[in-house]
UniProtKB/Swiss-Prot annotation:
Domain of life of the native organism: Bacteria
Region listing for Disordered, in residue ranges: 219-238
Protein name, entry field: Uncharacterized protein BU181
Organism for this UniProt entry: Buchnera aphidicola subsp. Acyrthosiphon pisum (strain APS) (Acyrthosiphon pisum symbiotic bacterium)
Compositional bias ranges of the Acidic residues kind: 227-238
Length: 238
C-alpha cells in the first residue's frame, strides 16, 4: 500500500464518519442486517472500499471530461459566431492568389488519384511498431485490483465494460491517481475561493481523529445541558 492509497482510504472513512454524525436516524432493520452480514463476511469492507473509490473516481473522471467538452463547445460556438459573414460579404469578396494556387493544387491531386492504388513513386520502407512503455513505479495491489472488484460488483457485462472503458486498460491505478489529484486540486481552488474549506481535498488531506472526538464530546455536553435544564424546570414546577 502506497501513501496515496493510505490517504484515500483514511479520507473515505473520515467522510463516512462525518456522514454518520450529520445524517438522520438509520433504519434499524437494515442496519441490523448489514451488521450481521458484515460479521459473516469480515473482508467485505475491503472490497466495499475498493468499489466506492473506483466508482467515485469514475464519476469524477467523467465529470472532468464532460466539463472539458463543454468548454470546447463554447469556444467553437464563439469562433463560429465571430466568423459569420455579412449579407453582402460574399458579393464583394475576391479570390486571393493563395486561393487560386490552392485550387490548382486540388486539380493536380484529383489527377494523381486516377493512378492505380498499388502504384507508388517511392520505395516502400519497412515499418517498425513500438510497444507502449508501461511505468511500474506505482505498482499497487489495492488499487490495481480495485477496478476488477468494482466491475464484478457492478453486476452485468454492460455496466462492467462501461466502467472498464472509463479507465486505462494498461495501468488503471495511474489513471485513478491522476483523476483524484485533478479533481482534488479543482475542489481545493473552488472551496478556497468560496468558503475557504479544504475538507474535500482527497489526496492531501490527513486524517484527523481529534476533530471527530471533539465534535462527539460537544454533542454529549449539549445533551447533558438539556437534561440539566429539564431537571431545573421540573423542580421549579414542583
Amino acid at each position: 500500500m502506497t501513501d496515496e492509497e493510505k490517504n484515500l482510504i483514511e479520507n473515505l472513512f473520515h467522510r463516512l464518519k462525518k456522514t454518520e454524525l450529520n445524517s438522520p436516524e438509520r433504519d434499524d432493520a437494515a442496519d441490523e442486517l448489514i451488521q450481521r452480514l458484515a460479521k459473516k463476511q469480515p473482508t467485505s469492507s475491503y472490497y466495499m472500499a475498493q468499489t466506492i473509490l473506483i466508482q467515485e473516481t469514475a464519476i469524477k473522471k467523467m465529470s472532468i471530461e464532460l466539463e472539458e467538452l463543454r468548454k470546447k463547445i463554447k469556444i467553437l460556438n464563439r469562433e463560429e459566431t465571430n466568423k459569420k459573414p455579412s449579407f453582402l460579404s460574399n458579393f464583394f469578396k475576391k479570390k486571393s492568389p493563395s486561393e487560386i494556387i490552392s485550387n490548382d493544387n486540388n486539380i493536380l491531386k484529383k489527377k494523381e488519384n486516377i493512378l492505380p492504388s498499388n502504384y507508388s513513386s517511392s520505395p516502400i520502407s519497412p515499418t517498425t511498431q513500438t510497444s507502449p512503455v508501461i511505468n511500474n513505479t506505482r505498482s499497487s495491489s489495492f488499487l490495481g485490483n480495485a477496478l476488477q472488484t468494482a466491475t464484478g460488483v457492478a453486476g452485468g457485462m454492460i455496466l462492467g465494460n462501461m466502467l472498464m472503458n472509463v479507465f486505462s486498460h494498461t495501468k488503471p491505478e495511474e489513471d485513478i491517481f491522476d483523476t483524484v489529484k485533478q479533481s482534488s486540486s479543482d475542489e481545493y481552488t473552488e472551496n478556497n475561493f468560496l468558503n475557504n474549506n479544504t475538507d474535500n481535498d482527497l489526496i492531501n488531506y490527513s486524517y484527523n481523529e481529534s476533530d471527530i472526538n471533539f465534535r462527539e464530546s460537544s454533542e454529549e455536553s449539549i445533551n447533558n445541558n438539556v437534561d440539566d435544564t429539564d431537571d431545573i424546570d421540573n423542580d421549579n414546577f414542583i
